[in-house]
Curated annotation (Swiss-Prot):
Belongs to the CcmE/CycJ family. One of its GO terms (biological process) is cytochrome complex assembly. SUPFAM superfamilies: Heme chaperone CcmE. It is found in: Cell inner membrane. InterPro entries: CcmE (IPR004329), CcmE-like_sf (IPR036127), NA-bd_OB-fold (IPR012340). This is Cytochrome c-type biogenesis protein CcmE. GO terms for cellular component: plasma membrane. Keywords: Cell inner membrane, Cell membrane, Cytochrome c-type biogenesis, Heme, Iron, Membrane, Metal-binding, Signal-anchor, Transmembrane, Transmembrane helix. Heme binds at H123, Y127. Gene3D superfamilies: Nucleic acid-binding proteins. One of its GO terms (molecular function) is heme binding. Pfam families: CcmE (PF03100).
Length: 149
């Protein structure tokens, strides 16, 4: 009977350790999960205010403003329905251009300014992330989204 209780205790302890490990993994996964939003979704209030997320769309033509310090850049990201001002301090990718696709990761300030800590540019003229193409299509720009797939 004593050996049976030991085995039962080991099984319960093993299951508890397994459950704790799974909870820790899920917690770490959720903290590192980054969601993707369009400027229209941000304007509608769907984006989180207190955590990092990605915003994607096209860099609006004529919107790039470089600051005197040479590393701070401000530009507008649009999904053709709404636009969002993005500030970024750092080196932009070589393929970053007006009228091209972009995905920026960062946080939204109280005054609807997106402060990016990472900017990713579309890597070739025939590619657009599926999320961005779908978002552009949902925003009412099916011709543009189809042309950029």
């Amino acid at each position: 009977m004593k050996a049976r209780h030991k085995r039962l205790g080991l099984i319960v302890a093993g299951l508890a350790a397994l459950g704790l490990g799974a909870a820790l993994v899920l917690s770490a996964f959720q903290k590192n999960l980054v969601f993707f939003f369009t400027p229209s979704q941000v304007a509608a209030g769907e984006a989180p205010r207190n955590r990092s997320f990605r915003v994607g769309g096209m860099v609006e033509v004529g919107s790039i403003e470089r600051q005197a310090d040479g590393v701070t850049v401000s530009f507008l990201v649009t999904d053709t329905a709404q636009r969002l001002r993005v500030n970024y301090r750092g080196s932009l990718p070589d393929l970053f251009k007006e009228g091209k696709g972009v995905v920026a990761q960062g946080k939204l300030t109280a005054d609807q300014l997106f402060v990016a800590d990472e900017v990713l540019a579309k890597h070739d003229e025939n590619y657009m992330p599926p999320e961005a193409a779908y978002a552009l299509k949902q925003a009412g720009a099916p011709a543009l989204a189809g042309a950029l797939k």
